[in-house]
Amino acid sequence: MTRLSDVVKVDSKGRITIPQAVREALGVEPGMLMALIADFDKREIIVSPIVTKPEAVYEFDLNLVDKPGSLAAVTGVLAKHKADIITSKCTSIARGEEASCTIIVDMSLSDVDADTIKRELEELEVVIQVRLRKFETRY
């Protein structure tokens, strides 16, 4: 795994500049959409490039039973329907009891719509709650 780390400054409008070496390595172009996941508990932000049309991108926000195989069951449903995971962030809320996952998915090649996948996820015994949101550009 190749990594590059850097310290960047936030400007007065809340923007950061992604270093050129990172933009080139990840293929980030001007005008490209980026998925942003903020974890308030860990005080961290994950930024991932989106290489598909924004109308095909959805966010699944799930609460799961925190046990081995829970995440595999969720990703199995996504894979079965050819929903491509762009980025994901999962954390244990209460170890051995509950976990939270945010999964951003490209639905452009999926054989079903996002609501169908949401219903299938809700039927899994390891899923406590599923919230679905269409990823929208804001700027």
Predicted regions and their residues:
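A conserved regulatory-domain signal marking ACT and ACT-like small-molecule sensing domains
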Residues: 50-139
